[in-house]
Amino acid sequence: MTSIAISSGSFDPITLGHLDIIKRGAKVFDEVYVVVLNNSSKKPFFSVEERLELIREATKDIPNVKVDSHSGLLVEYAKMRNANAILRGLRAVSDFEYEMQITSMNRKLDENIETFFIMTNNQYSFLSSSIVKEVARYGGSVVDLVPPIVERALKEKFQTPLK
């Protein structure tokens, strides 16, 4: 049986922390779908299409990764893809409480889909898309925080020269 995992998020933008979780998941599962969730309660910086393109470029060297978007419940998407796992990254203990609530709800919706938590590498434990955007907004270097394609996209959006 093929093991299929879903790694979801807003990825606005994808960071090296996200990429670390995706790469590590891709070593464990036969296929990993990286899914941009279109959350109507968030005002995204990058459009869904831009985020999909950035993720495709950032993951192009990982053959068992596929990139997609979804606007509904994650469990419904997982069922549609015959996925048996949801892959989540944890930066700190504070992430766990929120993730536990989401996992409990997902299990209530479909008890056959398991959630796997991966602790982020220490170097990314502080990292979030919000922090990346804030640093980039004021012209700070994000070279150690995001893939090169994302750095270029941020510079373009904020119209700041590359450092």
Swiss-Prot record:
It comes from the Bacteria. Pathway: Cofactor biosynthesis; coenzyme A biosynthesis; CoA from (R)-pantothenate: step 4/5. Gene3D superfamilies: HUPs. GO terms for cellular component: cytoplasm. The record marks 18 as: Transition state stabilizer. Its main location: cytoplasm. Keywords: ATP-binding, Coenzyme A biosynthesis, Cytoplasm, Magnesium, Nucleotide-binding, Nucleotidyltransferase, Transferase. One of its GO terms (molecular function) is ATP binding. Homohexamer. Belongs to the bacterial CoaD family. Reversibly transfers an adenylyl group from ATP to 4'-phosphopantetheine, yielding dephospho-CoA (dPCoA) and pyrophosphate. This is Phosphopantetheine adenylyltransferase. The gene is coaD.
